[in-house]
Amino acid sequence: SLSDKDKADVKIAWAKISPRADEIGAEALGRMLTVYPQTKTYFAHWADLSPGSGPVKHGKKVIMGAIGDAVTKFDDLLGGLASLSELHASKLRVDPSNFKILANCITVVIMFYLPGDFPPEVHASVDKFFQNLALALGQKYR
């Protein structure tokens, strides 16, 4: 679980990430699709998987919006993300291990875009948050 310090670190980090969420999200999604090509299977319905394509641009908005929403639900991620977990488990049928892959790609991109605002202790807090987020999104798979 997240400590009060972790929550504070994530809120501060998100305040800096949020204005650049579109850029960070697009880069992270494009990076995931390139570095982990097996993830493309979940986006086969998209005509173009290149980083600047319309579907990728839309996807990054959805993903980064969901992360921003989760930042407001620290104390009840399971309840707050239940419907999103259900969607990914039942309809989209995304392998839950991919949540961790995407979180890793987002973390890498954050470090590139905001190096001075992402020291190791903040990185650790954001990583814990993403781990909790992945667990919450994977809850309906059980």
Swiss-Prot record:
The modification N-acetylserine is found at residue 1. Keywords: Acetylation, Heme, Iron, Metal-binding, Oxygen transport, Transport. Red blood cells. It holds the Pfam family Globin. Gene3D superfamilies: Globins. InterPro entries: Globin (IPR000971), Globin-like_sf (IPR009050), Globin/Proto (IPR012292), Hemoglobin_a-typ (IPR002338), Hemoglobin_oxygen_transport (IPR050056). Residues 1-142 form the Globin domain. GO terms for cellular component: blood microparticle; haptoglobin-hemoglobin complex; hemoglobin complex. O2 binds at residue 58. PROSITE patterns: GLOBIN. GO terms for biological process: hydrogen peroxide catabolic process. One of its GO terms (molecular function) is organic acid binding. Heme b binds at residue 88. The keyword Iron applies. CDD domains: Hb-alpha-like (cd08927). Involved in oxygen transport from gills to the various peripheral tissues. Heterotetramer of two alpha chains and two beta chains. This fish has ten hemoglobins, 8 of which are anodal and 2 cathodal. The cathodal tetramers do not exhibit the Bohr effect, due to lack of the C-terminal His in the beta chains and to blocking of the alpha-amino group on the N-terminal residue of the alpha chains. The possession of both anodal and cathodal hemoglobins may be a physiological advantage for fish living in fast-moving water habitats. Belongs to the globin family. This is Hemoglobin subunit alpha. The gene is hba.
